[in-house]
Curated annotation (Swiss-Prot):
InterPro entries, sorted: TMEM258/Ost5
Subunit-level organization: Component of the oligosaccharyltransferase (OST) complex, which appears to exist in two assemblies comprising OST1, OST2, OST4, OST5, STT3, SWP1, WPB1, and either OST3 or OST6. OST assembly occurs through the formation of 3 subcomplexes. Subcomplex 1 contains OST1 and OST5, subcomplex 2 contains STT3, OST3, and OST4, and subcomplex 3 contains OST2, WBP1, and SWP1.
UniProt GO cellular component terms: endoplasmic reticulum membrane; oligosaccharyltransferase complex
Protein name: Dolichyl-diphosphooligosaccharide--protein glycosyltransferase subunit OST5
Lineage of origin: Eukaryota, Fungi, Dikarya, Ascomycota, Saccharomycotina
Pfam family membership, one: Ost5
Positions on the Lumenal side per record topology: 2-27, 78-86
């Protein structure tokens, strides 16, 4: 591809509009961290409850999956706010 083709393609393409702006991502990272800690700590409390083993396993699995999803989102938001764009 020649420079002229690349230049023409660059200027004819649509400008990129981010879904979540970079200036709000640190706020989402902090909120995600709080939610992650709350959900994962409630998963640990669910294990210590006096209910049946199957019920504890079910609640622990659900809460740990939700906590892991929030931990992943928090990692992406935190790394983007430090300038490592994921």
């Amino acid at each position: 591809m020649t420079y002229e083709q690349l230049y023409k393609e660059f200027h004819s393409s649509k400008s990129f509009q981010p879904f979540i702006h970079l200036d709000t991502q640190p706020k989402f990272a902090i909120c995600g961290l709080i939610v992650t800690l709350a959900v994962l700590s409630s998963a640990l409390f669910a294990v210590g409850s006096k209910s049946s083993y199957i019920k504890k396993l079910f609640f622990y699995t659900i809460l740990s999956v939700i906590g892991s999803l929030f931990a992943g989102l928090t990692t992406v938001f935190a790394s983007n706010s430090f300038g490592v764009y994921v």
